[in-house]
Every structure is written in C-alpha cells, then in structure tokens.
Amino acid sequence: MIVVKIGGSVVCKDPTKVVENLPNYADKAVVVHGGGCLVNDLLKRMGVEPKFLTHPGGLVSRYTDLETLKVFVMAMSWINKSIVASLHALGVEALGLTGADLGVVKARRKEKVLVVDERGRQRVVDGGYVGRVVDIAVDKLRPPPLKVLSPVAVSERGELLNIDGDQLAFDVAKRLGAERLVLLSDVDGLIIGGSVVPRLTAAQAEELVKNEEVRGGMKRKLLMAAEAAKLGLEVVISNGLVDKPIDAALSGRGTHVVKG
C-alpha cells in the first residue's frame, strides 16, 4: 500500500498529471489532498484576510475560526469531488470522502495553542476549529474503490475540524501499514544549496530542520518524514507537476527519507 498526498500547490496549479497517473495505483493506494490556496482565494473574495499562527520552532498553521471553517470545508469539497470526477472519466472507481464521512477520521479539537506573536513573545491563544487526529477507521479506506480523502475530521462532539493535510497523510499511512508515503508539491524535493537532497535518514532529516534554507511547509514535511521513517515508512517528497509524478517519485525522483 502507498499513500499519495496531493499538495495544495499542485491542486491549485495543475493536478492533471497526478490524477492521470493514479489509475496505475487504484488497487493499492489511498489519496489525501490539500488545497489551502483555494481557501485563501475564497476568503479574499469574501473580503476576509486569511490568518496564520506561528508556533515555537517556526511551524506555521492556519487560524480557523467558524467562518474560515465553513470556507475550508467548501473548498475541500470542491477539490475532492473534482478529483473524483476526473478519476471516473479515466475509468477509475473512486470514492471521495471527508474524515467526517463514515466517521473515518476522528479528531480532538485543540482548545488552546502556543504561538509566537509579532514581537517574538510566546502566548496561548484559542485553537479555533483545528484538530489533532485521534483515530482513523483504516478498513474503510482500503481499496477498492480508490478513496480520495480531504483533510476535514469530526470531533466526538460532532464538530467539523481542519486537519493538517500532510499530518493526515502520515497518520493514514502509519495506521494502514503502508510501505511508502508520497508527498507531492510544486518543488522537486528538499533543496539545499540549490540542489535536491536525494536521500536522508531520519536523523539527518531532524538535523536539517534547523537549516535556514528549510522553511514553511518543508519544515513540517521533514519533521513528519523523520517520525515516519523511524517507524519504517519511507517518505518521498517530490514534484507533482512533472509527467507521471507518482511513478517518478517511486523510481527515485525527489527526496527519500528512510529509517537510519
């Protein structure tokens, strides 16, 4: 089994090549997608400026109040069904789900989170409608049909929650016992000094998180990849905009993070 995460940058630029490659993996994959760029676009069209929180360590996450949550769910639903429709056009039986459907992904709401403000001070703020995964009904995700999962979970109180897409993909892969997790974005992998780093051990990945060239979403990807690799799960960070991107990633393209 493999888990393929289609990053928001790919979703918003051109997911065609990923979707066209998925029929080769319809019987052995689970797909997770992002789409934060569409959320940002919709919010701005509504006159709402997207808000982000910086956490100790430099990780950045979206602040999701109730109004943002509504837009988030709307955007993810559009992306999800668009991918599923494209797969059906290719002859692939696919089922689009949020984590709330069938109770597939259950999460606990983060009531409070620690952030770093614009003055560099740490403080605790309301967590909004963001969750941490506590359970995944993996048997409901196994193919057939090919499942396409959006990063929306449900709490024990019946609340819809925003879940980080990369983290959800990792949690799905871990619970499925997948062999590989393929993270597809609009870059060729981890780039240090202008070149792609082809292979890393978990320990090396953890160390590189401190590198000034590693920023934003790549920092989160490396931390998660290191954790996954320690469990024996190979993580590939690769480009989803190239021809046959899944084939390419599994054949050595991108950055491969392995146990060691």
Curated annotation (Swiss-Prot):
Residues flagged as site, Transition state stabilizer: K5, K221
E.C. numbers: 2.7.2.17, 2.7.2.19
Pathway: Amino-acid biosynthesis; L-lysine biosynthesis via AAA pathway; L-lysine from L-alpha-aminoadipate (Thermus route): step 2/5; Amino-acid biosynthesis; L-arginine biosynthesis
GO biological process, one term: arginine biosynthetic process via ornithine
Signal sequence residues: none
Main location: cytoplasm
EC category: transferase
Pfam families, alphabetized: AA_kinase (PF00696)
A GO CC term assigned to this protein in UniProt: cytoplasm
Superkingdom of origin: Archaea
InterPro entries to which the protein is assigned, alphabetical: AceGlu_kinase-like_sf, AcgluKinase_fam, Asp/Glu/Uridylate_kinase, LysZ
Localization, UniProt: Cytoplasm
Catalyses which reaction(s): [amino-group carrier protein]-C-terminal-N-(1,4-dicarboxybutan-1-yl)-L-glutamine + ATP = [amino-group carrier protein]-C-terminal-N-(1-carboxy-5-phosphooxy-5-oxopentan-1-yl)-L-glutamine + ADP; [amino-group carrier protein]-C-terminal-gamma-(L-glutamyl)-L-glutamate + ATP = [amino-group carrier protein]-C-terminal-gamma-(5-phospho-L-glutamyl)-L-glutamate + ADP
Keyword Amino-acid biosynthesis: yes
UniProt GO molecular function: acetylglutamate kinase activity; ATP binding; N2-acetyl-L-aminoadipate kinase activity
Binding site for substrate: G35, G36, R62, N162
Family under the similarity heading: Belongs to the acetylglutamate kinase family. LysZ subfamily.
Function description: Involved in both the arginine and lysine biosynthetic pathways. Phosphorylates the LysW-bound precursors glutamate (for arginine biosynthesis), respectively alpha-aminoadipate (for lysine biosynthesis).
Protein name as catalogued: Putative [LysW]-aminoadipate/[LysW]-glutamate kinase
Organism annotation: Pyrobaculum neutrophilum (strain DSM 2338 / JCM 9278 / NBRC 100436 / V24Sta)
Record gene name: lysZ
